Structure formats: structure tokens, C-alpha cells
């Protein structure tokens, strides 16, 4: 079974107004002590031999604040398998051609830029520290540094959003040479700045759904095939690391607030960077990964849920009532079902939670 390794880099310049992920804002770099703590935990999980993961993902926070030499130390300690996908999340304003070239030489072979919008006024509303000009420059620098596997993030249904804003952002990322795009609907999280003070001009839920369907249509038209609810790629550039999550493979997350599922068991690190640095944040067990998780995650994917694989893994079959519900979903245009595989359509992905409520 494949193994994905996630290394959490919580440090960032400032917290974006929509973000409720665990992070440590106000930083201009990643302390060497934090890198040493990650290395300490890596050695605990693999005391006798390297982990040899199939994928390695530096997430955050802002992982591009890492010194490339420290990224090289972490990659060398994990010793990913030959051909492993090694991803670094990056903010456009934090990188240069030289730093990207150094990350490439360290072993990073996939870069993911948080673009979100091509409009500076919107970026300011979101609390993003970069400009559209910096985003364009980051893509160009990545290509010159030797990156081919590049991804860009787009946020949908932002305040005062229009289809034209989406088109401009798609153009920026496509012109940047990115073969992968993640497109997310803005979600107002209670613990975010937007949750405490909602912005004006938010689309209604129906308008947000229309923006999502428009984005799917346009991305497909531009050659980005949808393979997951929020992810689109040209052939061969699907994100391998996240596919391990969605296929219920083994993944190990190291760092404050990082989650793992290994051998069917879930665990996580407490969301406390200082405790992690002091070696006072042991992983906490959090139940198991079971049939319900598999169903939920597989229905995020456009390939859908194989009922044969579902039965093989968990000994479960859909009941008569569940099959009748699936039939109604097909009639409503929310799903495709051939008797063996259930796959949600883009319209079905929008109401995925309601569909899951009937199937679980």
C-alpha cells in the first residue's frame, strides 16, 4: 500500500481572513529548532530505516518560508522512493527564481501556488499578501527553475464575485504553465476573521453553486479534467499525495495539528507549536478509518465508489433502500450508476453532503 508523508510548516507572515487552519503568523522564516523537531519525529516513526514514502507534501502555513537547505535535510531523512511526488506549497511573494531553483535541487518536484484571485482588490479583501503581478512572476520563475509539475489555487464565490473574475484567474494560472488547478468555494469558517466579521457582497448559496458549475465547465473546456470535487488536471498531473487520502491509503502527518491514518488507526498531533518544539506533544489516538470514511472520500472523486471494492474491503453492500435512493439521484442528474460504480456528477458534488446523509 502507498504511503504519503505530510510535514506541517505552521509559520506564515500573516493569517488570511478566510483561514482557520492551525498556523503561527508573524514569522519571516522557519526556525531551525522546528526543522530539528520534525527530524526528531521522523526518526521516531522510522528508527531503524527511512520511511521511504511514495509522496511527500510540505503543507502549511507557508512552507516556502523554509530554507531550501532545511527542505533538503527533511527529504534526505525521509528518503522518498524513486519517482516520488514531492510537493511544496508556496505563496507567490515568498519565492524567487533562485529560491525555487534551490528547492528543486533539494528534491522538490511539484510546486503549488496559492493564487486565489487575479484581482488585487480581491486579494486585499482576502488578506493575501501578494499581488497578481507577483503571482505571474512566481509561475515564470518556477518554470525557469525547472518545475513542470505546477499547481495553482483558485477561490470561487468570493465577495462581489463574477464569472469574469474567475476567467481572469484561470487565464493567469493557465498562462503560467500550470497543468493542475484546485478550485475551492469560499467557506466562512467560524474561527476565521471572516467568521467573526463576514465580508459584504457574498454570493447566495444558489449563486455559489452556479459559480462552481461554471468553473467546472470552463476548466474542462481548457483541458483540465475534473478528478475530485475541487481538483482538476491535465492528463498525468493529478495530485498523487491527496489521492492517497481519498483512496484511504496510509498517510503520516508530522507537526502541530497534523493528522495521520496508519494501518487503519487515526491519530493527530495537538495544535501547539511550542509544545511540539519542547517534545511535549505526543500524538493522540483518534479512532479508526472505516467503511464510512471510504464511502465519503471515494464519492469526492469523479471516478466514484466501486461497490465491488467496497464489499471486498469492508464486507458491505448497498441495501434496497440505498439502491432506490441512488436510482433517484441518477434521475435527478446528481449521479451516474452502472450497477457497479456510483459516481457523482458536478451537480451532485454540490449537494454531496445531502447525498451522503442518505447513504450513511
Language-model features, listed with the residues they occupy:
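Short amphipathic alpha-helical interaction segments
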Residues: 316-328
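C-terminal scaffold of the Radical SAM
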Residues: 2, 23-47, 52-316
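Local cysteine-cluster metal-coordination motifs and their immediate loop/turn environment
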Residues: 10-21
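Minor-groove-contacting beta-hairpin "wing" of winged helix-turn-helix DNA-binding domains
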Residues: 341-345
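Immediate flanking context of iron-sulfur cluster ligation sites
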Residues: 1-9
Amino acid at each position: 500500500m502507498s504511503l504519503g508523508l505530510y510535514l506541517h510548516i505552521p509559520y506564515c507572515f500573516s493569517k488570511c481572513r478566510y483561514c482557520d487552519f492551525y498556523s503561527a503568523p508573524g514569522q519571516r522564516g522557519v526556525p531551525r529548532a522546528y526543522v530539528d523537531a520534525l527530524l526528531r519525529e521522523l526518526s521516531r516513526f522510522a528508527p531503524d530505516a527511512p520511511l521511504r514514502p511514495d509522496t511527500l507534501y510540505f503543507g502549511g502555513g507557508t512552507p516556502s518560508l523554509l530554507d531550501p537547505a532545511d527542505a533538503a535535510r527533511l527529504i534526505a531523512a525521509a528518503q522518498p522512493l524513486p519517482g516520488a511526488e514531492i510537493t511544496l506549497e508556496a505563496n507567490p511573494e515568498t519565492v524567487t527564481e533562485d529560491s525555487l531553483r534551490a528547492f528543486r535541487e533539494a528534491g522538490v518536484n511539484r510546486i503549488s501556488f496559492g493564487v486565489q484571485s487575479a484581482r488585487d482588490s480581491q486579494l486585499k479583501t482576502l488578506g493575501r499578501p501578494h499581488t497578481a503581478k507577483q503571482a505571474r512572476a512566481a509561475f515564470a520563475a518556477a518554470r525557469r527553475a525547472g518545475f513542470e509539475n505546477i499547481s495553482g489555487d483558485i477561490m470561487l464565490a468570493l465577495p462581489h464575485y463574477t464569472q469574469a473574475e474567475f476567467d481572469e484567474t484561470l487565464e493567469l494560472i493557465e498562462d503560467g504553465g500550470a497543468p493542475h488547478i484546485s478550485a475551492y468555494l469560499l467557506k466562512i469558517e467560524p474561527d476565521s476573521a471572516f467568521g467573526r466579521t463576514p465580508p459584504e457582497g457574498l454570493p447566495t448559496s444558489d449563486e455559489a453553486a452556479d459559480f462552481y458549475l461554471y468553473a467546472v465547465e470552463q476548466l474542462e473546456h481548457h483541458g483540465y479534467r475534473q478528478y475530485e470535487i475541487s481538483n482538476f488536471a491535465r492528463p498525468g498531473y493529478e495530485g498523487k499525495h491527496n489521492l492517497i487520502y481519498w483512496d484511504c491509503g496510509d498517510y503520516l502527518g508530522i507537526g502541530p495539528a497534523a493528522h495521520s491514518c496508519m494501518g487503519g488507526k487515526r491519530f493527530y498531533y495537538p495544535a501547539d507549536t511550542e509544545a511540539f518544539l519542547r517534545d511535549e506533544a505526543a500524538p493522540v489516538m483518534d479512532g479508526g478509518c472505516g467503511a464510512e470514511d471510504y464511502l465519503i472520500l471515494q464519492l469526492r472523486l469523479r471516478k466514484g465508489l466501486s461497490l465491488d471494492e467496497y464489499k471486498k474491503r469492508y464486507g458491505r453492500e448497498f441495501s434496497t433502500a440505498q439502491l432506490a435512493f441512488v436510482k433517484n439521484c441518477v434521475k435527478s442528474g446528481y449521479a451516474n450508476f452502472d450497477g457497479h460504480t456510483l459516481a457523482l456528477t458536478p451537480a451532485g458534488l454540490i449537494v454531496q453532503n445531502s447525498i451522503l446523509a442518505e447513504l450513511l
